[in-house]
């Protein structure tokens, strides 16, 4: 059974994390150096999060339909994304096993992976603060 019952829950958890990162004074400039727009297309439940990371521009996070044109598209189950933010999924391994699929210059995404490790505890705190301890037991 999926961790999230609908797209609204995906946006309230994973989406909120992206919004927080886009406005974080320390991390946002580092992510913007990727100079790309990434769209995360999730299944179970169907949802989309598009993140604009362009150096010198404001970050932008859109849920669902967007006017942004992604350069990179990452497709996976929402559960896989959730487990990634808990620190339980290795991106390279997930790509090799087909748990994640990527279109576009994947190297841009892989360069960001080292930046996200400090975000894992933030995601856990965010879930706790939202009263979603049930999501902390993902495996």
Predicted regions located by residue number:
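Feature captures hydrophobic
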Residues: 1-139
